[in-house]
Curated annotation (Swiss-Prot):
Family to which this protein belongs: Belongs to the ATPase alpha/beta chains family.
Organism, as annotated: Hydrogenovibrio crunogenus (strain DSM 25203 / XCL-2) (Thiomicrospira crunogena)
Major location category of this protein: membrane
Secretion signal, residue range per the UniProt entry: none
GO-annotated molecular function: ATP binding; ATP hydrolysis activity; proton-transporting ATP synthase activity, rotational mechanism
Catalytic reaction annotation: ATP + H2O + 4 H(+)(in) = ADP + phosphate + 5 H(+)(out)
Protein name: ATP synthase subunit beta
Record key words, sorted: ATP synthesis, ATP-binding, Cell inner membrane, Cell membrane, CF(1), Hydrogen ion transport, Ion transport, Membrane, Nucleotide-binding, Translocase, Transport
UniProt-listed SUPFAM superfamilies: C-terminal domain of alpha and beta subunits of F1 ATP synthase, N-terminal domain of alpha and beta subunits of F1 ATP synthase, P-loop containing nucleoside triphosphate hydrolases
Known partners and oligomeric status: F-type ATPases have 2 components, CF(1) - the catalytic core - and CF(0) - the membrane proton channel. CF(1) has five subunits: alpha(3), beta(3), gamma(1), delta(1), epsilon(1). CF(0) has three main subunits: a(1), b(2) and c(9-12). The alpha and beta chains form an alternating ring which encloses part of the gamma chain. CF(1) is attached to CF(0) by a central stalk formed by the gamma and epsilon chains, while a peripheral stalk is formed by the delta and b chains.
Topology in membrane: Peripheral membrane protein
InterPro entries named among the record's database cross-references: AAA+_ATPase, ATP-synt_VA_C, ATP_synth_F1_bsu, ATPase_a/bsu_AS, ATPase_alpha/beta_chains, ATPase_F1/V1/A1_a/bsu_N, ATPase_F1/V1/A1_a/bsu_N_sf, ATPase_F1/V1/A1_a/bsu_nucl-bd
EC number(s) from the headed UniProt entry: 7.1.2.2
Length: 459
């Protein structure tokens, strides 16, 4: 079934199909002369469909022949995808030959039915102190890493992948949505070096790609993850960055002539976000644990894009620029970050009480900061002074050397088990470590390392 191009406006292509059945919404069309795929978005009348190009529209001209494939974009799935890099159409882009995959699946699929869903209470240990204590992850849950430009979303994401993918021996899928090509390259070699590349499928649609690619690349990665889940596996699904998915949707929406809504976003923002997020879920067959980086424009968490994402997550890890400015990394805010798992019935009363004790101390310190700035420490009561000292130790103990940052810091990373994290913070809260200098807590792993550092300072 052939049609011809009648209008080209950037990545938006109008195709006329005379006297034939019109392609369905989301059908893939092929411009054979240029090997370009288009995806149908609208039927505009007079036998014309409006499609978005999944690649550059350079070289297209009116009158070119277009064929209808009769189905949505399909991508390879299953074990042959592991260790390979794909583009949005499922073509390998790592110069390692074709993918020998028997099976292909369309990227547009319905979310699992309500009665197929399964909730999990099992915790997923990450080895990062602040996350395991304050906003623990659930196996099969959804986590968002929120942060502005340059506060460490990608580094935190890479550290979590390294820690979880190495400790958890299952398969992972990584979708690079609208991020820098350099980061994708670094990530590939990082995976290769740590020996987990043969368990990861990578799908990239970088910043330089047209909006159609960036809008659909997350669905390509998700389709690969869903296939593994439906085989009965526990899958890790990483998205960096879900905001770029929203942004690509905004661009496509404007190109298709829809009226923008708040702050210029597409009117279908929450529906598009819901469509992808409802598919990232765990069923009775298998689980998808998803970690998504979310860029926060101008550090404003009330912006419609991050605000819409919040509603879908089980845990939110909020990165704070003011913490990064004090030189404490990871710059995760223990007062802003939340998790549904931080419940005494899930994590146990010891963990819950320790986490809340830490948050209370830090909150009180935050309230006292204004008084300290105006009057100085001397005006505080003895009790408040010791509370401030403990809070500062907690802030520094939250810092931690990362494995993936070794190239920058020259220091080996630390994986801190949850029980060690709890032991350390309980000792700080109880006042056992009041005589240890606060610099000993900076970039230490567990509490034993802090005590060793303190000994060196004394000597």
């Amino acid at each position: 079934m052939n049609g011809k191009i009648v209008q080209i406006i950037g990545p938006v292509i109008d195709v006329e199909f005379k006297g034939a059945d019109l392609p369905k919404i989301y059908d893939a069309l092929k411009v054979d002369e240029l090997d370009l795929t288009l995806e149908v978005q609208q039927q505009v009348g007079d036998n014309v469909v409006r499609a978005i190009a999944m690649g550059s529209s350079d070289g297209l001209k009116r009158g070119m022949a277009v064929s209808n494939t009769g189905e949505a974009i399909s991508v390879p799935v299953g074990k042959p995808t592991l260790g390979r890099i794909f583009d949005v159409l499922g073509n390998p882009i790592d110069n390692a030959g074709p993918v020998e995959s028997e099976e292909k699946m369309t990227i547009h699929r319905p979310a699992p039915a309500f009665d197929e869903l399964a909730a999990s209470q099992e915790l997923l240990e990450t080895g990062v102190k602040v996350i395991d204590l304050i906003c623990p992850f659930a196996k099969g849950g959804k986590v968002g890493l929120f942060g502005g430009a340059g506060v460490g979303k990608t580094v935190n994401m890479m550290e979590l992948i390294r820690n979880i993918a190495i400790e958890h021996s299952g398969y992972s899928v990584f979708a690079g949505v609208g991020e820098r090509t350099r980061e994708g390259n670094d990530f590939y070699y990082e995976m290769e070096e740590s020996g987990v590349l043969d368990k990861v499928a990578l799908v990239y649609g970088q910043m330089n790609e047209p909006p159609g690619n960036r809008l659909r690349v997350a669905l390509t990665g998700l389709t690969m993850a869903e296939y593994f889940r439906d085989e009965g596996r526990d899958i890790l699904f990483f998205v960096d960055n879900i905001y770029r998915y929203t942004l690509a949707g905004t661009e496509v929406s404007a190109l298709l002539g829809r009226m923008p809504s708040a702050v210029g976003y597409q009117p279908t923002l929450s529906q598009e976000m819901g469509q992808i997020q409802e598919r990232i879920t765990s069923t009775k067959t298998g689980s998808i644990t998803s970690i998504q980086a979310v860029y926060v424009p101008a550090d404003d968490l009330t912006d419609p894009a991050p605000a819409t994402t919040f509603a879908h997550l089980d845990a939110t890890v909020v990165l704070n620029r003011s913490i990064a400015e004090t030189g404490i990394y990871p710059a995760i805010d223990p007062l802003d970050s939340t998790s549904r798992q931080l419940d005494p019935l899930v994590v146990g009363s010891e963990h819950y009480d320790t986490a809340r004790g830490v948050q209370e101390t830090l909150q009180r310190y935050k309230e006292l900061k204004d008084i300290i700035a105006i009057l100085g420490m001397d005006e505080l009561s003895e009790e408040d002074r010791s509370l401030v000292a403990r809070a500062r130790k907690m802030q520094r103990f939250f810092s931690q050397p990362y494995f993936v940052a070794k190239v920058f810091t020259g220091e080996d990373g630390r994986y801190v088990p949850l029980k060690e994290t709890l032991r350390g913070f309980k000792m700080i809260i109880s006042g056992e470590l009041d005589d240890i200098p606060e610099q000993a807590f900076m970039y230490a792993g567990d509490i034993d390392e802090v005590l060793e550092k303190a000994k060196k300072y004394k000597d």
